[in-house]
Protein backbone atom coordinates (compact mmCIF):
# COMPACT_ATOMS: atom_id res chain seq x y z
CA UNK A 1 0.00 0.00 0.00
CA UNK A 2 1.29 3.43 -0.98
CA UNK A 3 -0.48 6.34 0.76
CA UNK A 4 -1.20 9.55 -1.12
CA UNK A 5 -3.01 12.67 0.03
CA UNK A 6 -5.42 13.97 -2.60
CA UNK A 7 -7.43 17.06 -3.32
CA UNK A 8 -10.83 16.20 -4.74
CA UNK A 9 -12.07 17.81 -7.95
CA UNK A 10 -15.83 17.34 -8.39
CA UNK A 11 -17.42 20.61 -9.49
CA UNK A 12 -17.25 21.74 -13.11
CA UNK A 13 -14.89 24.55 -12.08
CA UNK A 14 -12.59 22.20 -10.12
CA UNK A 15 -12.62 19.62 -12.92
CA UNK A 16 -11.69 22.18 -15.57
CA UNK A 17 -9.02 24.02 -13.52
CA UNK A 18 -7.07 21.12 -12.01
CA UNK A 19 -3.45 22.12 -11.34
CA UNK A 20 -3.45 25.11 -13.74
CA UNK A 21 -1.20 27.88 -12.44
CA UNK A 22 0.39 25.84 -9.64
CA UNK A 23 4.18 25.91 -9.55
CA UNK A 24 4.66 23.24 -6.91
CA UNK A 25 2.91 19.97 -6.18
CA UNK A 26 4.44 18.27 -3.14
CA UNK A 27 5.59 14.66 -3.46
CA UNK A 28 3.01 12.26 -2.05
CA UNK A 29 0.06 14.44 -3.06
CA UNK A 30 -2.26 14.46 -6.03
CA UNK A 31 -5.62 15.55 -7.38
CA UNK A 32 -8.43 13.04 -7.85
CA UNK A 33 -10.98 13.97 -10.52
CA UNK A 34 -14.36 12.41 -9.77
CA UNK A 35 -16.94 12.09 -12.55
CA UNK A 36 -20.63 11.28 -12.12
CA UNK A 37 -20.52 8.48 -14.70
CA UNK A 38 -18.01 6.54 -16.76
CA UNK A 39 -16.84 8.48 -19.81
CA UNK A 40 -13.79 8.97 -22.00
CA UNK A 41 -11.71 11.68 -20.36
CA UNK A 42 -9.45 14.27 -21.95
CA UNK A 43 -6.88 16.47 -20.17
CA UNK A 44 -4.40 19.09 -21.30
CA UNK A 45 -1.64 21.04 -19.58
CA UNK A 46 -2.49 24.60 -20.68
CA UNK A 47 -1.22 27.01 -18.00
CA UNK A 48 0.15 24.10 -15.95
CA UNK A 49 3.88 24.65 -15.27
CA UNK A 50 4.54 21.39 -13.38
CA UNK A 51 5.16 18.06 -15.17
CA UNK A 52 2.46 15.58 -14.19
CA UNK A 53 1.54 11.94 -14.58
CA UNK A 54 -2.09 10.88 -14.83
CA UNK A 55 -3.86 7.60 -14.13
CA UNK A 56 -7.23 6.81 -15.67
CA UNK A 57 -9.22 4.72 -13.17
CA UNK A 58 -12.34 2.56 -13.52
CA UNK A 59 -15.39 2.85 -11.26
CA UNK A 60 -14.07 -0.17 -9.31
CA UNK A 61 -10.78 1.62 -8.56
CA UNK A 62 -8.60 -0.25 -11.08
CA UNK A 63 -5.98 1.81 -12.88
CA UNK A 64 -6.52 1.21 -16.60
CA UNK A 65 -3.52 3.24 -17.84
CA UNK A 66 -1.02 5.92 -16.82
CA UNK A 67 0.47 8.67 -18.98
CA UNK A 68 3.03 11.45 -18.54
CA UNK A 69 2.02 15.01 -19.43
CA UNK A 70 4.19 17.91 -20.59
CA UNK A 71 3.98 21.36 -18.93
CA UNK A 72 2.08 24.01 -20.92
CA UNK A 73 1.13 21.51 -23.66
CA UNK A 74 -2.11 22.12 -25.55
CA UNK A 75 -2.13 18.50 -26.74
CA UNK A 76 -4.96 16.38 -25.30
CA UNK A 77 -4.16 13.31 -23.23
CA UNK A 78 -7.19 11.03 -23.50
CA UNK A 79 -8.27 7.85 -21.78
CA UNK A 80 -8.50 4.95 -24.21
CA UNK A 81 -11.78 3.80 -22.64
CA UNK A 82 -14.55 5.23 -20.44
CA UNK A 83 -13.43 5.65 -16.81
CA UNK A 84 -14.88 7.24 -13.67
CA UNK A 85 -11.77 8.83 -12.12
CA UNK A 86 -8.44 10.38 -13.00
CA UNK A 87 -5.54 10.95 -10.61
CA UNK A 88 -2.86 13.56 -11.35
CA UNK A 89 0.43 13.39 -9.45
CA UNK A 90 3.95 14.81 -9.85
CA UNK A 91 5.51 13.23 -12.93
CA UNK A 92 7.20 9.91 -12.23
CA UNK A 93 5.30 9.19 -9.00
CA UNK A 94 3.49 6.14 -10.41
CA UNK A 95 6.70 4.64 -11.82
CA UNK A 96 8.66 5.38 -8.64
CA UNK A 97 6.00 3.58 -6.57
CA UNK A 98 5.62 0.67 -9.01
CA UNK A 99 1.99 1.57 -9.75
CA UNK A 100 0.48 1.03 -13.19
CA UNK A 101 -2.28 -0.60 -15.20
CA UNK A 102 -3.97 -3.27 -13.10
CA UNK A 103 -3.10 -1.65 -9.76
CA UNK A 104 -6.07 -0.65 -7.62
CA UNK A 105 -6.68 2.40 -5.49
CA UNK A 106 -8.84 2.78 -2.43
CA UNK A 107 -11.42 5.40 -3.32
CA UNK A 108 -12.80 8.03 -0.93
Language-model segments: which ranges?
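Compact, glycine-rich, soluble single-domain proteins
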Residues: 1-108
Amino acid sequence: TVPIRVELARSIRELSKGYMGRDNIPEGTGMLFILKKDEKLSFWMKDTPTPLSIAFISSSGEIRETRDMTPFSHESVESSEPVRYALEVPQGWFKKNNIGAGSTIELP
